[in-house]
Amino acid sequence: MGDSRDLCPHLDSIGEVTKEDLLLKSMGTCQSCGVTGPNLWACLQVACPYVGCGESFADHSTIHAQAKKHNLTVNLTTFRLWCYACEKEVFLEQRLAAPLLGSSKFSEQDSPPPSHPLKAVPIAVADEGESESEDDDLKPRGLTGMKNLGNSCYMNAALQALSNCPPLTQFFLECGGLVRTDKKPALCKSYQKLVSEVWHKKRPSYVVPTSLSHGIKLVNPMFRGYAQQDTQEFLRCLMDQLHEELKEPVVATVALTEARDSDSSDTDEKREGDRSPSEDEFLSCDSSSDRGEGDGQGRGGGSSQAETELLIPDEASRAISEKERMKDRKFSWGQQRTNSEQVDEDADVDTTMAALDDQPAEAQPPSPRSSSPCRTPEPDNDAHLCSSSRPCSPVHHHEGHAKLSSSPPRASPVRMAPSYVLKKAQVLSAGSRRRKEQRYRSVISDIFDGSILSLVQCLTCDRVSATVETFQDLSLPIPGKEDLAKLHSAIYQNVPAKPGTCGDSYAAQGWLAFIVEYIRRFVVSCTPSWFWGPVVTLEDCLAAFFAADELKGDNMYSCERCKKLRNGVKYCKVLRLPEILCIHLKRFRHEVMYSFKINSHVSFPLEGLDLRPFLAKECTSQITTYDLLSVICHHGTAGSGHYIAYCQNVINGQWYEFDDQYVTEVHETVVQNAEGYVLFYRKSSEEAVRERQQVVSLAAMREPSLLRFYVSREWLNKFNTFAEPGPITNQTFLCSHGGIPPHKYHYIDDLVVILPQNVWEHLYNRFGGGPAVNHLYVCSICQVEIEALAKRRRIEIDTFIKLNKAFQAEESPGIIYCISMQWFREWEAFVKGKDNEPPGPIDNSRIAQVKGSGHVQLKQGADYGQISEETWTYLNSLYGGGPEIAIRQSVAQPLGPESLHGEQKIEAEARAV
């Protein structure tokens, strides 16, 4: 449908058409037979006012078109166009939108034309209200179903829930130029196309997500076939792949920013507290040497109130965010992924953690994602807090059968919080890796990533180990009656429980199920609450997840200081809140012989979910309340069932049920009574809306300025959708030297927009960050480095091919060297240009085995490759490392006349490098 709009050559015959004219004609009658609407057709030929009836009557519109040779006509009910000559549907939306385009780009009129082909700044002005009112007359966007491809309801429900997360959807709609990848299967492109179809003004009733379904099956074979899968597993796999395809390295620009800001001391004093405590400096006093600025930095600590948020709305004809401004929807700043860190707590120092609060810090950029589904870096020490009793971090590994509806949650007993004191934290360095670890970020990590501080204390020596772990979702246990009683007595004895309903959601599984469900609800409503037990709320599940655990018995803590198993205690708190909080309720249990589903109703708030009780004192997030965006529900048993999603439309604020290709409006009470499985919450902030309106007012002033400022388009998208967008991050289109990386220059217009001086100064004073950019140029330093890197790669790969060719031609080599294939694959990716980072020193430790005599031999079954001595010498001279593992071949001399043929002996020896 999208391709046909450029193929019709008859659009030039259309006269001046406005929507008001079409609406006026729709209230008339057929000029031939006098019949009234609906489904009248208006001729679009220049100076032709004819209105005729359609095929449901005498079809005078077709007769008129054939007689007069007027090819184009428009349906006055649906506003769809038909070309009789092309015999297909065409589109008029570009002509209808023409009056709107001039009002949305004021910078083209008031600023000199740019020398570089950059897009105008997407700032709304006062007269955009008219375009919004015209948009409101159209059908709400986003209400598009998805066809079931065969037990694919788990995918459809997950995609609908993600589609109704405005920060993510707005990125794919407004920042399409940033969706670039050379990684297969290019799932981000398929998702972008799907989102564009779902949110198009001329949306179909449903779409068929074939391309995305095919791509996810290539990524994870578990989703191949037509078996029912877990929607949570699909969400993780999809977002992992989107991150991998869209991730970009974080540019270390501390020195650059300091150099640019050194001449503005007054501004520096105003924003002295702009940098929020990072996890590096929160855990360390001397970790600033290897830190770069990232999205996560920046808080207005210089003022008494929290840092305010601003909005620059995008073009009114496309932006979802303008609708959000009218409805006062609230958003927040999704902070970034960080590595796990270990903290050692000495028993002979202070007995509180107050010292942690006083650590000066600056924000830390996100770290690389793990390739595992949970995407949490594995700690190298005992500070990893995932035990068999209850995971104290958001990491949980699914082990259920692939054909079941969900994966099994681990047993989650809720324990009383023991009384104990924590010691002052001191950092243990994680140990330098041989290869420099590159930090990455993406729109996925910006929106969905939060972090948790997990601590384990030895009750004998009081040593405390801490781990900072990144989470994408929180998998919460559903507490039973006994656990709920302990929680309420120990934690919520002074906090009244929020009211909620006890009824489960209506499961559309036939009349029998409906009747049974109706009777059950009636019985529940007539029975005292003490009979069924207390209402389980989402806050109870959060309290159960964050409750302290005692480590004793079979689950004792291995203390590094005591060198023994000791009784301990562990707990966790949220260190950084995400923009979108994804909550997964553990409704499925898979035991050895059977599986079952927990059908307990969990009451969850539609607005005002407050996470303050679960925050660490060192939490950097200012906004702690969330509003519900969408909820995925599962109807059925552990072995089979059906997924649907309830989502709030961001344009009109109404709730809708998405059941494959069927979309139905529902009341919010239906959502409250739903049996939630996966919930998406979004930060709320009224202050953000007011600040956005202030920026719109500044933009409408149209003050003439001599300087134009370039700002990151991606950061402006955060303005549109985040409550806490953080400091301006122009590093996303700059290199570490302050110029444009050569590989980005050809699409720089997709990365930046132009701001007038008054808007830039306001944003810069409020949010900090930067750096200020008035001129775009290709970085000559990066160009030289790229050329040198290309030359190095070419020399290394040519030399290897030459040496390996000679090795293959050698019939009986006297010595063969072994090299780890893991390291070799990293080197191969580097020389082929797939990875910009060199592999680091050769690491043969994985394929080496130490014998009792101290000699190192080749490990049996090791993943290794064979190279010549010359090749080993060449690679070792470039990268170093080891140990050296050589397989020597020698022919033994015959010991007697019976030994006629000589015996070949293969001796593996290793020489430490």
UniProtKB/Swiss-Prot annotation:
GO cellular component: centrosome; endoplasmic reticulum; perinuclear region of cytoplasm
Protein localization: Cytoplasm; Endoplasmic reticulum; Cytoplasm, Perinuclear region; Cytoplasm, Cytoskeleton, Microtubule organizing center, Centrosome
Gene Ontology terms: biological process: endocytosis; protein deubiquitination; protein K48-linked deubiquitination; protein K63-linked deubiquitination; proteolysis; regulation of G protein-coupled receptor signaling pathway
Main location, first listed in the record: cytoplasm
ZnF (UBP-type) intervals: 6-111
Positions of modified residues (Phosphothreonine): 257, 376
Catalytic activity: Thiol-dependent hydrolysis of ester, thioester, amide, peptide and isopeptide bonds formed by the C-terminal Gly of ubiquitin (a 76-residue protein attached to proteins as an intracellular targeting signal)
Record remark: domains: The UBP-type zinc finger binds 3 zinc ions. However, it does not bind ubiquitin, probably because the conserved Arg in position 55 is replaced by a Glu residue.
Family assignment from sequence similarity: Belongs to the peptidase C19 family. USP20/USP33 subfamily.
Record protein name field: Ubiquitin carboxyl-terminal hydrolase 20
Organism listed in the record: Pongo abelii (Sumatran orangutan)
